[in-house]
A protein has these predicted regions:
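Short, surface-exposed loop/turn segments at secondary-structure boundaries that line and modulate
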Residues: 4
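Fe-S ferredoxin-like electron-transfer domains
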Residues: 7-110
C-alpha cells in the first residue's frame, strides 16, 4: 500500500476534492485535474512545509546543486520559507560503510 505522506502528487476531482493520486485507485468516469491554480498553490504550500521541516544547511550540503527538493522549490517559485523549523537536530547515522543516513534531511522517516 502507498503511504502518500508528501502529498506532492495531489490532484483534484470534478467535485473539488483534493487527494494524493498515489493512494487513490482510478475509477471509470473519474475526471481528474492535475494543474489547476488551486493545485499549484496547494503544492507550493506543501513544498514550503517540507522545507520548514528540513534541515537548512543547503549551502554546505553535499547534494547542493543536485538536490531534488531545491529543484522543486525553485521550479515552484518558493523563494523563502514562511514557517519556523521546530524539529530537533538528530544525529547522522554513519554506521554503514555504503550509506549515510541523515534523518534531518527527510521528514518522512521519523
Amino acid at each position: 500500500s502507498t503511504f502518500g505522506a508528501c502529498r506532492l502528487c495531489t490532484v483534484e476531482d470534478d467535485r473539488g476534492r483534493l487527494f494524493a493520486s498515489c493512494s487513490e485507485e482510478p475509477r471509470d468516469g473519474m475526471v481528474i485535474y492535475t494543474h489547476t491554480e488551486r493545485l499549484r498553490k496547494h503544492r507550493k504550500l506543501i513544498v514550503e512545509l517540507l522545507l520548514a521541516a528540513h534541515c537548512r544547511d543547503c549551502t554546505t550540503c553535499v547534494k547542493s546543486g543536485e538536490c531534488k527538493l531545491q529543484e522543486l522549490a525553485h521550479n515552484m517559485g518558493v523563494l523563502k520559507v514562511r514557517y519556523e523549523n521546530y524539529n530537533e537536530i538528530r544525529p547522522v547515522d554513519y554506521s554503514s560503510p555504503a550509506i549515510v543516513r541523515d534523518p534531518n534531511k527527510c521528514s518522512c522517516l521519523f
